[in-house]
Swiss-Prot record:
One of its GO terms (cellular component) is cytosol. A motif ('KMSKS' region) lies at residues 334-338. PROSITE patterns: AA_TRNA_LIGASE_I. NCBIfam families: metG, PRK00133.1. Zn(2+) binds at C145, C148, C158, C161. Gene3D superfamilies: HUPs, Isoleucyl-tRNA Synthetase, Domain 1, Methionyl-tRNA synthetase, Zn-domain. A motif ('HIGH' region) lies at residues 13-23. Transmembrane segments: none annotated. The lineage of its organism: Archaea, Methanobacteriati, Thermoplasmatota, Thermoplasmata, Thermoplasmatales. The gene is metG. This is Methionine--tRNA ligase.
Amino acid sequence: MIGIKILVNCALPYANGPLHVGHIAGAYLGADVFVRFNRLIGNEVLYVSGSDEYGTPITVRAEKEGKSPQEIADRYYAEHIETFKKLGINFDIFMRTTYPEHSSVAQEFFLKLLNEGVIEKGTMIAPYCRKIGRFMPDRYIEGECPYCGYKKARGDQCDNCGRTLDPQELINPVCILSGETPEFRETEHFFLRLDLFEERLEEWLKTKTFWKPNVLAYTRNFIQGGLKKRAITRDIDWGVKVPLEGYEHKRIYVWFEALIGYITGAKMFSEVIGKPNYWKEFYFDKDVKNYYFIGKDNIPFHSIIWPAMLLGYGELNLPYDIPANEYLTFKGEQFSKSRGIGYTVDELLRVIPPDYLRYYVASILPETGDSDFSLEELVKTVNSDLIDKYGNFVHRTLSFINKYDLKITKPNSLNDEAFEYAQNAFKEYCDELSQVHIKRSLAIWLNLAIYANSYFNKSEPWNLIKTDRDQCNYKLYVSLKLAQYLTAMIYPFTPTSAKAIWEQLGVNMDIDSSFSILNSINDFSVKPSRIPFEKLDIDKLKL
């Protein structure tokens, strides 16, 4: 795997509210860990996301607040950028779908599919609110989900079961602005012919035996139900304009154009670095692996609609993997910024360090099933794993060396069981992370931390310093190697604290290159120990 190109696309968050912890667990933290890991092993990564700023999620918020959609988008774009920055998540580019560059890319994509016969005109029945006097697409309509019975399902999707919906499927639908029952009227729109790609998508899915079972099952079930053409335009003012004469009042559906935002982002980054065709290396080179990190509710858009769009366009790479996570819950309920359930990221970062949040969320990622977030468990996990096991081991090792002012010299060879254990743990860790198994890789790291503490205790350097200086030097060198492995391996998860500890180990190499020397015998020039961890007290966390 080493030395290949990797494209990592992260779901574009809607710019209609603050980021909550469920968002981070759903897509962004796993992607960031994966990107950092791939760069550590020498892969070339393009890391793309952006701000999803069109469509009804934005206009609904704007109308409720008496603001313009652009004002809402501007506010939350800036807020999201700052939240990601505080959390240590740094995309190569974070584009905005309201950029003119994106409109151009989306319109070109639309026209290409239209010319290829993949998009066609047709009519559909859409909700119309007589009281307000206009069509009310998608999130302007709420009602009961016909599949799971959730009472607050939206006209485009059910937040509870993840099903994509049409407004007329809802039981007892109402307009969220007027409270009135909408009437359904005929309106002309453009449709994506998903049915044209059913067989090709089924064949493609047969090659995805390594996908998460939940993603594969969801996608197969969706296809087995029969793919139908899907409307990709809306009667709305806020969005990318349909680039055809006579249809200037129509807008391209947000979920169609937002997916194209991945390509927009790659193109814009290519312009920024002065290599306009760089993006093509990630979309046309068949050796490149494209990963899409998303939440459960976005699975059908990325595993069916987007691949169909790519097939329709022609020659563009299909997703290699879609490691979608399930939901993060709070006291058994799904995190929701619209319903005020759970914490926003900014709320938590006001009382705990970013690395603490990153570590805990990584340890409970809902990779194959829902996970529940608990502040009490966060405190216990951080105190136990990061501080009592990892931090304590490193501090004891460095403090002992500094206490006796020792200059630890490297041995000619390392024929030590502990070194072999660390090498094997590192290999397993890399194997798991290469497959986007975030929690498994973290569990391997934690087992190594437990082993390292045991090794230090059994070595008894406090006795060896008196009886056998050479053996004491050797045991402390092995302890430093264990600390080095642990620090490099935790770096993708807790980058700020890992970097601080790496510098205290006194390795003559930046931590971003750390993986290249782990299995070798290197020098250490130990600095004073200042472990960047403090225990959390649940009673002092005021939220």
